[in-house]
Amino acid sequence: MANLEESFPRGGTRKLHKSEKSSQQVVEQDNLFDVSTEEGPIKRKKSQKGPAKTKKLKIEKRKSIKSIKEKFEILSLESLCEGMRILGCVKEVSELELVVSLPNGLQGFVQVTEVCDAYTQKLNEQVAQEEPLEDLLRLPELFSPGMLVRCVVSSLDVTESGKKSVKLSVNPKRVNKVLSADALRPGMLLTGTVSSLEDHGYLVDIGVGGTRAFLSLKKAQEYIRQKNKGAKFKVGQYLTCVVEEVKSNGGVVSLSVEHSEVSSAFATEEQSWNLNNLLPGLLVKAQVQKVTQFGLQLNFLTFFKGLVDFMHLEPKKMGSYSSNQTVKACILCVHPRTRVVRLSLRPIFLHPGRPLTRISYQQLGAVLDDVPVQGFFKNAGAIFRLKDGVLAYARVSHLSDSKKAFNAEAFKPGSTHKCRIIDYSQMDELALLSLRKSIIAAPFLRYHDIKIGTVVKGTVLAIKPFGILVKVGEQIKGLVPSMHLADIMMKNPEKKYSPGDEVKCRVLLCDPEAKKLIMTLKKTLVTSKLSLITCYEGAKPGLQTHGVIIRVKDYGCIVKFYNDVQGLVPKHELSTQHIPDPETVFYTGQVVKVAVLSCEPSKERMLLSFRLLSDSRPKDPGVESSQKKTGAVRIGQLVDVKVLEKTKTGLEVAILPHNTPAFLPTPHLSDHAANGPLLHHWLQTGDTLHRVLCLSQSERHILLCRKPALVSTVEGGQDPKSLSEIQPGMLLIGFVKCIKEYGVFVQFPSGLSGLSPKTIMSDKFVTTPSEHFVEGQTVVAKVTNVDESKQRMLLSLRLSDCSLGDSASTSFLLLCQCLEELQGIRSLMSNQDSVLIQTLADMTPGMVLDAVVHEVLEDGSVVFSSDPVPDLVLRASRYHRAGQEVEPGQKKKVVVLHVDMLKLEVHVSLHQDLVNRKTRKLRKSSRHQGIVQHLEESFAVASLVETGHLVAFSLISHLNDTFHFDSEKLRVGQGVCLTLKTTEPGVTGLILAVEGPASKRTRMPVQRDSETVDDKGEEKEEEEEEEEKEEENLTVKSKKRHSLAIGDKVTGTIKAVKATHVVVTLADGFVGCIHASRILDDVPVGTSPTTTLKAGKKVTARVIGGRDVKTSKFLPISHPRFVLTILELSVRPSELKGSYSALNTHSESPVEKIRQYQAGQTVTCFFKKYNVMKKWLEVDIGPDIRGRIPLLLTSLSFKVLKHPDKKFQVGQAIEATVVDPDVPRAFLCLSLIGPYRLEEGEVAMGRVMKVVPNRGLTVSFPFGKIGKVSMFHLSDSYSEAPLEDFCPQKIVRCYILSTAHRVLALSLRSSRTNRETKNRIEDPEINSIEDVKEGQLLRGYVKCVLPSSVIIGLGPSVLGLAKYSHVSECVPPEKELYNGCLPEGKLVTAKVLRVNPMKNLIELSLLPSDTGRPDVFSPAPEPKQEERSGGAEEGQKRKEKNQKRREEKEEPQKSQRGGRGKRERQESESEQELVNKRPKKSGAAEEDDSGVEVYYREGEDEVGEPKLPPRGKQTKSTEVPRLHLSSGFLWDVGLDSLTPALPLREESSDSEDEQPHQAKKKKGKKERELEKQKAEKELSRIEEALMDPGRQPESADDFDRLVLSSPNSSILWLQYMAFHLQATEIEKARAVAERALKTISFREEQEKLNVWVALLNLENMYGSQESLTKVFERAVQYNEPLKVFLHLADIYTKSEKYKEAGELYNRMLKRFRQEKAVWIKYGAFVLGRSQAGASHRVLQRALECLPAKEHVDVIVKFAQLEFQLGDVERAKAIFENTLSTYPKRTDVWSVYIDMTIKHGSQTAVRDIFERVIHLSLAPKRMKFFFKRYLDYEKQHGTEKDVQAVKAKALEYVEAKSSALED
C-alpha cells in the first residue's frame, strides 16, 4: 500500500436522491476519523494571514468531502448516541450487571434493572420482603456468555478517569419502542422477556404498547427441552421469537421460539419495515451495490442501503465479492441521526437464536513478537494475523503511545511488530491488540494475572474512610483497607498518603470474577521473607509465618492470612505466661508471627500458637490429663460440682466424679444479680452444687453456669445449636456477655451470640447501655435479623418484644425464685459454727423481738442490740422510728423487716401496727392496699393497711426489667395496690403478692388510724363480696368455702358425663371433676372410660387437687389444707385403697410431672380434638398434662392422614409413645406410629419440602430432621418423569436408609416402605459397583453428555459410561445432537459391558443389539402385546397427545382453506388419498424408513437445501407436498403423526396453474337447483335459530341484539363483558361496561351495582392499581359507599391481595365504625388468615364503637366465625359467656346449637339441649327446643334416646299443668 489515498477511488458517480444526499452530509459531519477534517480550523486560522491561500483551502476541502463519501468508518464511542439500537453479545455476567460486547471492539454495560419491567418489579418485591423469592432467577441464570441480545444505548457516562462508559438496556419497552401494534406482521423476528406464567403458556413482554404477546406451551416445549434443560420459563427470561399470528390489529400476538422457525425468519417487504423501526438482529437478503477496499455497500428490502465494514465481511470470501451479488446479511445497528445501517456478513450472525460459540481467547494478556500486518486502514487501525491463524485488530489509538509518535508508513502489509493481546471481541471474532509500550511492559493486564501474595506497585487514587484506592494497572484497581495501611492503626492516613503517591503493596485477596483486589501496606507483611499461607492445604504443622489479628476474644485471638484463610490462637497459646485478659495485650490489626499447630482443610479449621514451638518443647502431663477429662464433659450437660477454691470473680470447682477442674463465675450463680454475691460469700470449700450447666469448654478451661433460666432452657431443648436453626421472631434466653457503647452482646448456652443495638435495647431511651444491663445478667432476647453468611444476628431486648406472657405471673415466678435462693443461703448460714450467723439464719421477717436502744445516729436512725446475742446489730431507719422519742438503754419491741446476710444486719421497725398486727384471715387473690416498708434490689417488703401483715412482692416483672427512672422507683412509705398469691407466711416469713398497676400507687403514706383502717377493711370486704356475686354468673354457682385436704374421701352424685371428664356434685354443694385418666387403673385401648359412669350415679372419690374457676388451670397443692372451688377427684380403685402418702405426688407442678416422662416411654392418653390449623391431635394424659400428636406421627396410612379426626372419638383411649417432653409449656409430644426417633430401617411419614429437577426430593419430618430422596429411590419402577407426581407439602411414606449424616438418606420404594407388597421390582437398587454384573440389563437416567461419551446414573452414587460408539448405530457427528436426544434426566436402558472395580468404572451400551430397545435416534416402534401391560397408561397418554397435536395442526390449515370452495376440497381429498396409498405401496418398508434417514432429512431442512428422498418413487412438484413436522422434531413420533405441508395463499395460484386437471368443472342445471334449495334451507335454519329464545349468543352482534331487548339486565351485560375477556379484548370489555352504566335505568340500583362490581373485578385482574382506584372512586360516587367498599374488599381477598384488603378495611373502620357489618367482615377476614389474636382485638374494638344494642349480635357473629375459621373452644367460651349474661336469648341458644351440631360432638350437643330444656322460658319457645331436640335424636340417636326426650317433654307439660292448677 504505497499510496494510502489509492484506497479511495475518485471519479463520477450516479446522482443521489435527496434523502441520500442529506444522509451523506450527516455522515460527513460525524466523521471522527478523518485527519484532514480535524485540521480544517487550523488551516482557516492560518489563512487569515495570507488571502492567497483561501482558494487552495477550498479545493482541498472539496477533495476531502468527496473522498469521505467513499469511506467506511468503523464504530467508535464518539459515534454512538443515546437511543441507538445495536446488536450485542453477552460477554460477562455478574449478579448486578451484564458486560456486552458490541461491534468494532466496543463494549457496554446492562444494569440488572434494565432487563424488563416485570423482573424489576420482582426485584423490588424481594427487597421489600428481605428474603429471596423462589420464582426469581438471578442474572447469571437468565443470561449466559455468548447470547446475542438487542440493546439500546440508554446513556453515555463519563467515568472518574475521564473515559466514556456505554450504558445499555435490553428492556423490550425501550428496544422495541419504535414499533406500534398496527405495525406488527406475521414472520417478524422480535425479542422479548417473559413477564408472567399462565396455565397454557407464557405472556411475553415485547415492548409494544397495547399489545399482549402470548407464547403457548406447545411452541415453547422444544426450547425448554433443548436450551432450558427442561425447566419452565421464569420471569425475565430473554427470548428471540417469531410472530406467528396477529389478531385485533396487533392487540394480541402469538409467538413461537421453535428453532426451525426462528432460524429461518427473514425480514421481508410485506412486513413493512422502515428506517424508523428497523431493528438490529434482523436477517435480510441483500444485493451488493459497490465493492471497495474498506467494505461493501448493499441494497436490501428494495429501498434501503447499508454498509458492511471490513471487520464484518465473511473471512473465507474476502476479495471474492462482486457487484449485484446476492448475500444474506444481519443488521448490526441503525444510527438514529445519520440513518446509516450497518450490516454483517459473518456466518455467526446468520442463524438467529443460536449463541456465539467462541466467547474468549486463551492467549489473553500474552506478549507476542514479530506479528505481521495483514492490512492497514487509515483512521481505523491495522489488521494482524497471529501464528495460530486468528485475525487480530489494533485501533489507531493503540498503535502508538501518542499521536506524535505514530507513523503510518510503519504499518505496511508484511511489516512485523511487537504487541500484546488485550481482549477478544466476540462480535468481530477478532483478538484486540495494543502496540503501546506502556501496556506491553505492564506486569498485569487483567485481574486473572495477579497472584495472591505478589508484591505490586501502584498509584494512590483516592483516600476514603474505609481505606485507600490504589491503581495497579490500566484497568485494575485495588483497595487497601484501613486496618492494613500500616503496622499500627492509623487515625489520619491523609497525613502520610496523598493521591498520586507511588506505593508498594502485597496482594491479600484477588477475585477475578468479582474484580475484587485487596492489598496491604503493612511493612512487616510487604517485606516478610517467611512462607505465605494462601490456602488451608498449604498450612503444615510447624510452619511459621506472619498474620494479622482480626478479632480478640476471651478464648484467644483469630489471625487472618492471605486469601481469607484464618486460624485460632487459643488462650493458652498466646504466651508462655498466663494472660487473663487477651484484650489488654493484643489489638485488632496487629501483625504477629505465628506457628501452625494443626490444620483441617476439609473443615477450614486451623490452630496456631504465638509460642513459636520447637520440637524439644516439654509437654505438661497435667495438661494432657485435664484435656482427657474435659473430653468427658460436653456443652449443655448438667453436672454436679464441688467447690475447691473461691476467687474474686467466682468459684474454682471440680466436676464430679472425675474431679475435672472448671470455673463458675459469680454472676452465673443466680438469675438475680443481688443473689450471686451472696451465694459466692456463703459457699464454702467442699460444698457440692447440683444441676450445674456446662456453658463452654476449651483445652484448659471449662466454664459453668448455675442460672436456673439457662438450665431450664437447655433441659427443654429450646437452645439452638447453630445459626441455621434460628429464625427471626424466636425468643431465646441468654446472658449479657459484654457491654459496649453501641449495644449489648448476648450469649446463649450453645455458645452462639448476638448484638442488641442501643435502638432496640429498651423501650426507653438509652444513653448508656451499662445503666440498663450488667455483665452476666440473665436476659430474654428476640431475634430480629439473622445473617448466616456473616454468622451474625441482631437481637431486641425490649420488653414489648420479649414478653413471656402475663406480667403478673412472671413477676410472681421471679419472686418465688429469688426467695427460694435466699432460703438456700439461710441453710448455708445455719451450717456455720458462729452463734451470730446461726441466729441470723433463724430470723425471718415478721418476727417480733425485744431490743435495747444502743445508739441514735445523726440521720435519725436507731441502732439496737439484743441480750442473747451481743454482736447482733438491729437497725431502724428514721422512717421506722415512727416518730417515737428513744434514748440509749431504752427497751422496745421491734418487728424484723429484712435480714442483710452480707452485712450481718437486721432491718427492723417500731411501727405499732406492724408489731401488733391483727389476726385476720386473708383470702387468696384478694386485693389490698399496702405500704412499702423495705426495698431490696429485686423485691420489696410491704405491710397491709388492714392487718399489718408483711408481704413481699417483686420489683421486676421480667428478666429484662432492670432499669427504672427515678419517678418510677418505689420509696419507703409509698402506698401500693397488692394482689395476694398466698395467704399464710411460709418458711420465708412473708406473704407473697404481686403489685397492681403503677397508676394506683400513692405518693404519701396512707392513714394508719385504727378507725380508718376498720372502715376501709369493711368497705373492701363488701366490694369483694359484690365481685364474687358477679363472678357466680360466669362460673359455677357452688363457690363456697370448704375444709377439704388432699387425700380426703368424698361422696357425690354424677351430674354430667363428658367425653374426657365427669362432673360430680358433692354432698355440701361443692363441684368436683373426675378426669378420664382417674377412673380406671388399666384403661383398654380404644375404649372411653367416662362411659363406665352414668349421670345420677353416686360415687366415692379421693381428692387429688383443685382447678381455678377463671383460668381452668390445674392447681397443684403444696400444703395439706386448701380452699378451692372445683375439686379434682379420682375414682381409681388403687387410689381409693391407698393412703395419703401414696398421693403426695399430686402436689407436684405440671412442669415437674412433665420432667418425669422420658422419650420412648409408652403412655395412655385420651383424644380431645384435631386442630386443623396446627395439624396435630390434642390429647390429655392427665388432668394437668396435655399432649400433642403431630399429623405425620398419627398413622402410616394415607387414608387416616387425610381425615385423622374420623379415626378417633372424643374421649377414646389411645396408646402413644413419648417423643419429646416440652417442659416449659407443660405438654408431651407423642407418636402413634412407634418410633420416637428416626433410626435406620424405620418407616416414617414425611412432608415434601422441595422438588429438585433431575435430583430428587427434600423431605421434612416432625422430629426436626430433614432427609433427601434420590431419583433412584422414588419407585421400584423408573419412569420418564419420576418427579411429576410430587409437589411441596405432599405427604410421603419414607424408609430411613441411613442416619449417618445430618441429612438423612431416604427411600420411597414400595419394597422398602411396605414389605408386605409383592409387586415386581423392575429396577433393583444399585448402591455400589458390587451390585452391577456384566451382561446385566439396567435402566438409568442420563446425567450429562461429554465430548466422547454419555454418563448415565444407575444409582444414587453409581455412574456408568457409554461411549458414542455404544450409544447409537447412527453415530451423529456432533455433540449437540446427543444433547438434544439425550437430555439430562432421560430414562434409558443399558447393558453392562464391563465392570472394573479397581478403576470404579462401568462401561455400558445403549445399542439396540444389546438392549433390544430402539435406537436412541429413531422413533420408538410399536410395543409388543406383552410389553404393553407395564406402560398402557403412558401409551394412551402419548396417543392422546399425538391426536391433539394433529388436530391443532389441522385447525389453521382448515382456516386457510375455508373460502376456497370445491377445488381445495378436491386437492385435500387427493392429497389424503396419496398419503393413504403410500403405506399400502411400501408395505413393511415403512418400518424401515425411520430413525436415521428421517433424522438427516430434518437436518437438511434446517440448512435450507432440500434433497430428494433417499428411496422410493420421487414425487413431482405437482404431487403431494413434502411431509414436515407438526411441532418440532420428536424422536418418539411415528410417520403417522407427520402431516403434509399444505401450500400457503401465495402458492395457491401457482399450484393451480400447474395442476390443470384439478380445475373447476361446469355445473349442470340439476346441480344448480340442488344448491339453490340447499341455500334456502340454510337461510331458514339461521332465521329460526335467531328467533329461538334459548339460543346462546355467539358473536358481538348477538349480544347487541340481546342488550337492546333487555337493557336493564346486568346478567346480559356481564356475559357480554365475559365474551370479550375470553378473547383477551380488554378495552372492548371496558367499553361494554361503560355502555351498561349509561344504558341501565337509574332506578335499577342493584343492576348498576352489579356492573360496577364487574368493572372493579376487570380492573383488578387486567388493569393497574391506578385504573382500579379511579373506577372505585367513581363507583363510590354513584352507589351506596358501604356496599362498594365491601365488594372491593371481597375482590382483594379472593385475588389474595391481603395487604390491600387490610388497608381498605382500616379505611372502612374509620369511615363506617358504626356499621356492624364492617366489623363482622373484618373479623372474618382476619380469622381467614389464621390471625386469632387479631380477631380478639377486632371484637374488643367493635364493642367499644358499636351501640350496646348491637353487642350481642356482634358477639354471636364472631363466635360463629370462630367455629368456622378459628378455635372451636374459644367459640364455645364466647357463647357460654354470652348465655350466662343473657340466658333467655333463645336466638343465641339456637345458633349455639346449630354451630355445635356442625363442629362439636354428640355429647356436647346433648349437653346444650339438656341445659336449654331446663330453662324457665315461655311454653311456645320450649316447644320449639323440645321439637329440635327430638328431631336431633331421631337423626343421630337411638330409639331409647328418642323415648327419653319424649319423656322429658311430657314431664315439662305435666309440671306446667300442675302449676296452672295450683
From Swiss-Prot:
Bias type Basic and acidic residues, positions: 1006-1019, 1423-1437, 1445-1454, 1566-1577
UniProt domain S1 motif: residue ranges: 83-171, 187-258, 281-346, 365-436, 453-522, 542-611, 636-707, 729-798, 846-911, 1047-1120, 1160-1233, 1241-1309, 1335-1407
Tissue specificity remark: Ubiquitous.
Compositionally biased spans, kind Basic residues: 43-56
SUPFAM superfamilies: Nucleic acid-binding proteins, TPR-like
Gene3D superfamilies: Nucleic acid-binding proteins, Tetratricopeptide repeat domain
Keyword Phosphoprotein found: yes
Keywords of this entry: Acetylation, Isopeptide bond, Nucleus, Phosphoprotein, Repeat, rRNA processing, Ubl conjugation
Example of a GO cellular component annotation carried by this entry: cytosol
Chain positions with N-acetylalanine modification: A2
PROSITE patterns xref list: S1
GO MF, one example: nucleic acid binding
One GO term of the biological process aspect: rRNA processing
HAT repeat copies, ranges: 1590-1622, 1696-1728, 1766-1798, 1800-1835
Placement of covalent cross-link Glycyl lysine isopeptide (Lys-Gly) (interchain with G-Cter in SUMO2): K1424
Subcellular location: Nucleus, Nucleolus
Region (Disordered): 1-56, 999-1036, 1406-1520, 1545-1577
Modification sites for Phosphoserine: S7, S438, S1468, S1490
Segments passing through the bilayer: none
Acidic residues compositional bias, start-end: 1020-1033
Assembly and oligomerization: Interacts with NF-kappa-B p50/NFKB1 and NF-kappa-B p65/RELA.
Role: Essential for the generation of mature 18S rRNA, specifically necessary for cleavages at sites A0, 1 and 2 of the 47S precursor. Directly interacts with U3 snoRNA.
Name assigned to this protein: Protein RRP5 homolog
Source organism: Mus musculus (Mouse)
Species lineage: Eukaryota, Metazoa, Chordata, Craniata, Vertebrata
